[in-house]
Every structure is written in C-alpha cells, then in structure tokens.
Amino acid sequence: MDKDYSAPNFLGESSGGNDDNSSGMIDYMFNRNLQQQQKQSMPQQQQHQLSPSGFGATPFDKMNFSDVMQFADFGSKLALNQTRNQDDQETGIDPVYFLKFPVLNDKIEDHNQTQHLMPSHQTSQEGGECGGNIGNVFLEEKEDQDDDNDNNSVQLRFIGGEEEDRENKNVTKKEVKSKRKRARTSKTSEEVESQRMTHIAVERNRRKQMNEHLRVLRSLMPGSYVQRGDQASIIGGAIEFVRELEQLLQCLESQKRRRILGETGRDMTTTTTSSSSPITTVANQAQPLIITGNVTELEGGGGLREETAENKSCLADVEVKLLGFDAMIKILSRRRPGQLIKTIAALEDLHLSILHTNITTMEQTVLYSFNVKITSETRFTAEDIASSIQQIFSFIHANTNISGSSNLGNIVFT
C-alpha cells in the first residue's frame, strides 16, 4: 500500500508485555477492515473515533468469516494479559490485612474484578491517547471512591465498636445498680413487721424507764412540791426542792456559826457593868459583824446592774440581790414568836412591796425568802436594804427579850 495508515492499538497492549508479532497481526486485521470502511462511507475525520465497547468503529456484524476466526485464535493470548494482571494484584495483598478488617475484603475483590473487566492501557498514535485518558480518569475516580468507601467503612467499624462497648458498659452498670437496689429493698413483709415491733418495744421500754425514774424522784420530795402527776410538774417540783435544800444548808451553817458567836457573846455580857442598860447590851450584840457587797453589770440588760450585798450578825444573816427595782431578800435567823409578821410590816414601811414569800424551818432556825419590788421613787442600793433589815431584827430581838415596846416606824435607811 502506498499510504501508511496507523490505527490505534486497542487490544493487546494493556500490560505492555505481549509479543510484537501478535500485536502486529491484530493491527493488520483491524487496519484492513478500517481502510475498506473509510473508502466507502466514513469521512477522514471519523477514522480515529472509538466505539463504546473500546474497539474500532467497524461493527462486528459486518466482519467476514476469516476475520472472526483470526479474532477467535488470538482470544487466548488476550486472556493471558488479564490473568497476569490478576496475579500481580493478588501477590500484593496482605492476608493479615483481611483478618484485621474483614469488612474490606469484599470491597477489594469487587475492585479487582472491575480492573479485570476493563483494559488497563489503550494507546495509539492519534485516537488512542483520548481513549487511554478516559479509561485512566475513570479508573482513578473509581479507585478514589473505593478508598473513600474503605476509609468510611473502617471509621464506621471503629465508631460502631466503641459505641457497642459503651452500651455494654452502661448495660452492666445498670444491672449492677438494679441488683444493689433490689438487695437493699428486698425485705419481706415479715421482716418489716418484725422491725416495726422491735421499734415499738424499744420505745415502750424507754417510756417505762422514764416513768420509773419520775416515780422515784416524786417519792423523794414532799407532796407539797408536786401539784400534778405529770412529767413537767414532777421535774419543776424537784428543781424547787433542790433550791430549798441549798437554803437549808445555808441555815445550818449559819446556826453553827451563831452558836459559836453566842458563846463568845455571853462571855462578853457577863463582864459588863451592872449600870449598863439592857438596850445598850442588845445593840452591842446586834451589831453586824460581816458586811460585803458586789456590783455586777449584766450584758445586754439595757444598762441594768445587779447588786449583791451580805450582812451577817449573831441575830440574822441577810443576803440581798437587787436588779433595777426588783430585789430578792434572804434572811436566816432563829425562830421567835411574831417575828414573820413584824418583818413583813417593817418591809412595807420601807416601801418594799412583797410579791412572793417562801419560809423554810428546821428546828429553831428559819429561812425567809422575799421577792419584793421597790415602790418609792428613791433609789436604794443592796447594802442599804441589808443594813435596814439588820436594824429590824435588832429591834425585834430587843422587843422579845425586854418587856416594852419598840418603835419600828423610826427605822429609816442609813
């Protein structure tokens, strides 16, 4: 032929390892058919176009019998190229990789099958470059999609595994909590009833012991200190009785001290001259021996001060506590007839209103407790009140021992 025509090599060059003779014979077979078709109908510009199947533009139904037989003879050679590609790809696969990620095995096999079905390289001098580029672009896009799918599958597998582990842990924690709660609340009705009866028995025993203690406490006090048989009355009466016992202790101490002072006083009276009057002798005996005072300012009491004063003599021991216009007076002395009435009258003459009176006696000793309120506008001190009470008992003692009367109205505060 005068004119050399180079047709694209569509088959036999995908791996680049086939013989030159086989490729040349295939090229000759297709070139002869293309030349005949081009001379008859096809224009010069459409000679290099590709069919959708990857072969030349000549359809298979227009090929003669000899061409078909030649194509069938070279089919086995073309198959060798595919098996070689398959062997090359299979040798590069690591089986351990499939053991680690079994989900990816199917996708890799699908990828290999797509590569076997499609030609890897299609080159020609004019039209082969276009077909090769299209095939390479398609394969690259396919590989990118497969890689993305593989990565997504791996990520989904890892995420799914972590979520499963978390769900399993949450399930186990819930089971443990449910077991603990069941263990705490798993009480039968018999156990609940037994616990309730135990509480009732303990409370009953406590009340029984409390009532027993109150009964013993009530038996130790006189009946006058307990007006009612309830718990508050018994405890209140016991407190009052203890206070009275403290006052009685003071009375006994004062009586003992008076006896000592009385003996010394008798010795002093025997040595006095006969010219001395009885009034003078009584006045000397009634002179106070101990006078003490104390002033305490109360915190938060609105500026009020609590004053305490004591005035002790052989006739009486006087203790006064003054807070504002309220005072508490305690007098410990020997029992004398008419002494209480005279004392109350003298206190009223001193403008002291008596609010409460308590009397405790033991043999010949008596303890007077007065709660009084100062009604006069004159401000008195605790020491003034104690000194005035000592004068009152001096006159009472003198009036008792000496026939005659004593004018109590002349007693004033010194």
From Swiss-Prot:
Q: Where is this region: Disordered?
A: 1-61, 142-197
Q: Which UniProt keywords apply?
A: Activator, Developmental protein, DNA-binding, Nucleus, Transcription, Transcription regulation
Q: Which domain of life is it from?
A: Eukaryota
Where are the compositionally biased (Basic residues) regions? 176-185
What processes in GO biological process is this protein linked to? guard cell differentiation; guard cell fate commitment; guard mother cell differentiation; negative regulation of cell division; positive regulation of cell differentiation; positive regulation of DNA-templated transcription; response to low humidity
Single GO molecular-function term? protein dimerization activity
Q: Where is this motif: LxCxE motif?
A: 249-253
Q: In which tissues is it expressed?
A: Resctricted to stomatal cell lineages (at protein level). Expressed in roots, leaves, stems, and flowers.
User: Which residues does the UniProt record annotate as the domain bHLH?
Assistant: 194-245
* GO CC field: nucleus
Pfam families for the chain: bHLH-TF_ACT-like_plant, HLH
Q: What happens when the gene is disrupted?
A: Excess symmetric divisions during stomata development leading to abnormal guard cells clusters formation. Reduced seeds set and low biomass. These phenotypes are complemented by MYB124.
Basic and acidic residues composition-biased segments: 166-175, 187-197
* Skewed-composition ranges (Low complexity): 12-24, 35-49
Which InterPro entries is this protein grouped with?
bHLH-TF_ACT-like_plant, bHLH_dom, FAMA/SPEECHLESS/MUTE-like, HLH_DNA-bd_sf
Induction (UniProt)? Inhibited by low relative humidity (LRH) via epigenetic CG methylation, thus leading to a reduced stomatal index.
Cell compartment(s), UniProt: Nucleus
Where is it predominantly found? nucleus
Task: Describe its partners and assembly state.
Answer: Interacts with FAMA through its LxCxE motif. Self-interacts. Also interacts with bHLH071 and bHLH093. Interacts with RBR1.
User: What does this gene product do?
Assistant: Transcription activator. Together with MYB88 and MYB124, ensures that stomata contain just two guard cells (GCs) by enforcing a single symmetric precursor cell division before stomatal maturity. Together with SPCH and MUTE, regulates the stomata formation. Required to promote differentiation and morphogenesis of stomatal guard cells and to halt proliferative divisions in their immediate precursors. Mediates the formation of stomata. Prevents histone H3K27me3 marks and derepresses stem cell gene expression.
Supply any other comment: Plants overexpressing FAMA exhibit ectopic stomata.
Q: Output this protein's name.
A: Transcription factor FAMA
Designated gene of the protein: FAMA
